[in-house]
Amino acid sequence: MRLLIVEDEKQICDAVAKSLYDAGYEVDTCYDGEEALEYILTENYDLIVLDLNLPGMDGMEILKELRQSNEETKVLILSARGQIADKVEGLD
Protein backbone atom coordinates (compact mmCIF):
# COMPACT_ATOMS: atom_id res chain seq x y z
CA MET A 1 0.00 0.00 0.00
CA ARG A 2 1.41 3.37 -1.03
CA LEU A 3 0.89 6.39 1.23
CA LEU A 4 1.60 10.11 1.07
CA ILE A 5 2.07 12.07 4.30
CA VAL A 6 1.51 15.83 3.92
CA GLU A 7 2.47 17.73 7.07
CA ASP A 8 4.45 20.96 7.43
CA GLU A 9 5.77 20.10 10.90
CA LYS A 10 8.81 18.03 9.93
CA GLN A 11 9.05 16.12 13.22
CA ILE A 12 5.38 15.06 13.07
CA CYS A 13 5.63 14.16 9.39
CA ASP A 14 8.77 12.09 9.89
CA ALA A 15 7.38 10.31 12.98
CA VAL A 16 4.15 9.34 11.19
CA ALA A 17 6.10 8.26 8.11
CA LYS A 18 8.54 6.15 10.13
CA SER A 19 5.75 4.39 12.01
CA LEU A 20 3.96 3.55 8.77
CA TYR A 21 7.18 2.52 7.01
CA ASP A 22 8.06 0.23 9.93
CA ALA A 23 4.59 -1.32 9.59
CA GLY A 24 5.40 -2.24 6.00
CA TYR A 25 3.89 0.60 3.99
CA GLU A 26 5.56 2.45 1.11
CA VAL A 27 5.63 6.09 2.26
CA ASP A 28 6.36 9.43 0.58
CA THR A 29 6.44 12.70 2.51
CA CYS A 30 6.12 16.37 1.70
CA TYR A 31 5.98 19.50 3.81
CA ASP A 32 3.94 22.06 1.83
CA GLY A 33 0.82 22.29 -0.28
CA GLU A 34 2.36 22.95 -3.68
CA GLU A 35 4.74 20.00 -3.38
CA ALA A 36 1.86 17.79 -2.19
CA LEU A 37 -0.30 18.68 -5.18
CA GLU A 38 2.60 17.87 -7.51
CA TYR A 39 2.98 14.41 -5.91
CA ILE A 40 -0.78 13.80 -5.98
CA LEU A 41 -1.15 14.69 -9.65
CA THR A 42 1.85 12.64 -10.82
CA GLU A 43 1.80 9.58 -8.51
CA ASN A 44 -0.81 7.04 -7.44
CA TYR A 45 -1.51 6.71 -3.72
CA ASP A 46 -3.84 4.40 -1.84
CA LEU A 47 -4.10 6.83 1.08
CA ILE A 48 -3.10 10.44 1.73
CA VAL A 49 -2.61 11.66 5.31
CA LEU A 50 -3.26 15.37 4.93
CA ASP A 51 -2.70 18.27 7.32
CA LEU A 52 -5.05 21.22 6.80
CA ASN A 53 -2.70 23.97 8.00
CA LEU A 54 -0.01 24.09 5.32
CA PRO A 55 2.07 26.95 3.95
CA GLY A 56 0.97 28.19 0.53
CA MET A 57 -1.86 25.95 -0.62
CA ASP A 58 -3.75 24.64 2.42
CA GLY A 59 -5.11 21.14 2.91
CA MET A 60 -8.69 22.00 1.93
CA GLU A 61 -7.50 23.40 -1.41
CA ILE A 62 -5.49 20.23 -2.00
CA LEU A 63 -8.51 18.10 -1.11
CA LYS A 64 -10.69 19.98 -3.62
CA GLU A 65 -8.07 19.53 -6.37
CA LEU A 66 -7.77 15.85 -5.53
CA ARG A 67 -11.52 15.31 -5.69
CA GLN A 68 -11.65 16.93 -9.13
CA SER A 69 -8.91 14.70 -10.52
CA ASN A 70 -9.25 11.42 -8.58
CA GLU A 71 -12.34 10.47 -6.60
CA GLU A 72 -10.85 7.08 -5.64
CA THR A 73 -7.96 8.11 -3.38
CA LYS A 74 -8.78 7.93 0.32
CA VAL A 75 -7.76 10.84 2.56
CA LEU A 76 -7.18 10.92 6.30
CA ILE A 77 -7.22 14.50 7.59
CA LEU A 78 -4.63 15.19 10.29
CA SER A 79 -5.09 18.59 11.88
CA ALA A 80 -5.20 20.58 15.09
CA ARG A 81 -8.23 22.49 13.77
CA GLY A 82 -11.21 21.80 15.97
CA GLN A 83 -14.01 23.74 14.32
CA ILE A 84 -17.10 21.84 13.17
CA ALA A 85 -17.09 23.84 9.92
CA ASP A 86 -13.62 22.48 9.08
CA LYS A 87 -14.80 18.92 9.66
CA VAL A 88 -17.87 19.39 7.48
CA GLU A 89 -15.83 21.05 4.71
CA GLY A 90 -13.45 18.08 4.76
CA LEU A 91 -16.35 15.70 4.17
CA ASP A 92 -17.65 17.54 1.09
Describe each model-derived feature in a short phrase:
Residues 1-92:
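N-terminal/domain-start alpha-helical segments
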